[in-house]
Amino acid sequence: MTARAKVTLHHAPNTRSTGALLLLEELGVPYDLKLVNMKANEQRSAKYLAINPMGKVPAVVHNGALVTEQPAIFMYLADLYPEAGLAPAIGDALRGPYLRWMVFYGSCFEPALIDRAQKHAATPQSMSPYGDYDTMLKTLTDHLERGPYLLGSKFTAADVLWGTALTWTTSFKLVPELPVIQGYIARVNERPAMIRGRAKDADLKATLG
């Protein structure tokens, strides 16, 4: 086995793992796809739990190692294929901002959205990982105003992550459809690999019924 052995993506169409599928399309690399039928509750089967005990998708297996958690998968894959140019290299001035926005997604954005959607009682700001929803959202939108992408003119894997997340969350009204957000979503989703990947995901969903 080598560092460039083919990646296997365990994927359920039209879920969070769609983002990982889109990233692989952006990277333009061959990969193996293992479908997880969530309608049949396959994510809770003994077979799948042996792969990912959390019973969640996406999950990536490469060189015998398991990678889970959306930002970790994105960082792993983008670094695995540096020739695609979707991750600033260590030492690049953009590496820090890139990592910031990758981690901000899981540590601030998603927790804030879940708390808001579930109408959880507000945690004191000093104890909350994201402070408060309004501060989290303003931090994001102020940064997007600088555009066109999270790292300025450079499109990276972080934009695949955030473009996918914002497409979902605005469609479910969890995030307001502000012009700055809608413009960013449009720029990300108009890319050929994103269009191709979404069509592939729709076809995969259809095969599962």
Model-flagged regions — what are they?
Residues 23, 78, 165-166, 198:
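Active-site-flanking alpha-helical
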Residues 42-44, 188, 207-208:
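Short Asp/Glu-rich motifs
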Residues 38-39, 158, 202:
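Conserved beta-strand edge residues that scaffold enzyme active sites
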Residues 197-209:
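Terminal-tail/helix-coil boundary detector
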Residues 50, 162, 190, 199-200:
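Phosphate-coordinating loops and pocket residues in cytosolic domains that bind phosphorylated ligands
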